Structure formats: structure tokens, C-alpha cells
Amino acid sequence: MDELKKLAGVYAAGFVEDGMVVGLGTGSTAYFFVEEIGRRIKEEGLSVVGVTTSTQTTKQAEGLGIPLKSVDDIDSIDVTVDGADEVDPQLNGIKGGGGALLMEKIVATPTKKYIWVVDESKMVDQLGAFKLPVEVVQYGADRLYLDFESKGYKPSFRVTEQGDRFVTDMKNFIIDLDLGKINNPVALGDELKAMTGVVEHGLFNGMVNKVIVAGKDGVKIVEVKD
């Protein structure tokens, strides 16, 4: 599996050129993309500026010598490469398995070319088998949990290995919704966004331009159909 992830991540780095501002994703597949950018800076003299999507990626990028800027200090991002937990045929996706969905969406928004790197197991006919993360403010989180429960969304607070509630980089909680199937990702996204106390959700609808899929037969690119 790691070999497939590496294949996708390294392939995606081919879209990065000198002088670009590059969004650096979070997660096990994006990790290989960031590593490859670091290698190209060191070995090929690639000149880029990175914008990170989590403290985890910031540490990785700093260790590789990738120059970084805050998303607040740039006008736009040329290309962002990130992973995804599930991707449907319309290229809507679920992200946030690593807990970085808010920062990932903030970086994706000013991005000109937004690319996901996945292994073929992430491509699904319908979203929802992977639990949908919802980032919520800590104050009132238990009330939101009950709201989700009453809607039949099978919520659970994400917890650490120690059993404490997981806290995101932005100091929020995550409630994972076990929905089974999501029939209308756009409508659900709108519904969740309208709930007071919800900061962001892990549905990335209509945001990605292309998905690089690594499988046993190599790499294929899936693009949004016009």
C-alpha cells in the first residue's frame, strides 16, 4: 500500500514548477508528495514556497528545508496536493481522517489547481462508508452531538489513544458521523454548515480539479468532466 501511495505522491510532484506557491497536504499519501518536493529542492535546486495544512506537515516541511509562508501572506496558491479518504465518481470527497480538514479546506480555497493523491481503494461509487468528520467548537459540542444523534447520524467524538477527546490544530473537537451512505453530499454539506457550532465538515464538494490514482497497473489521472 505504501508503494502505491508513494507512486501517487511522487507523480503529483511533477506538477510543481519553479517559482510556484505550493499547498502541502496532510496524511499518509501527501507525505510522499512533500518528501519529493524536499528532494527536488535539495537535488535539483527547485525554488518554491510551501503553505502547510497542519502542524504535522509544517514539521515535515521544515525538516526538509522547504521555505514556508502562512496562507494569510500569499495572494493565491498555484497547486495544492493532498490526500482524500473517499472519492466518488463526481470527484466529491471525504477528507479529515487525520483531523486536519479545516486547515486543508482553508488552503484549498485560494488554490488554482487542486489535486488529490490516492490509492485505488479510495475511489468509491458513493460516499459515506468512511465516517464523515465534523469539526465543532468545544463550547456546546455535547448539544451538537445530541442534535446529530436525533437526526440518526450515529455520531461519535474522536478520541486520542489515551481516551481523551481529540483536539484539532485549531483547538476544536471532531465528531465523526457514521452515515453509511451519503445520497446528496452537497445538500448534507449545506445542512451541516448551517448548524451553529459547526466550524467545518469533511465533505469537499466540487473543489478538486484532478485525482491521481495509484493502482497495481500504475498511475491514472481522473479529471472533472466539463
Swiss-Prot record:
Subunit note: Homodimer.
This protein's name: Ribose-5-phosphate isomerase A
Gene3D superfamilies hit by this protein: 3.30.70.260, 3.40.50.1360
GO biological process, one term: pentose-phosphate shunt, non-oxidative branch
Gene name linked to the record: rpiA
Record family assignment: Belongs to the ribose 5-phosphate isomerase family.
Record has Heme as a keyword: no
Pfam families: Rib_5-P_isom_A
Lineage: Bacteria, Bacillati, Bacillota, Bacilli, Lactobacillales
Record organism: Streptococcus thermophilus (strain ATCC BAA-250 / LMG 18311)
EC numbers on record: 5.3.1.6
NCBIfam families linked to this entry: PRK00702.1 (NF001924), rpiA (TIGR00021)
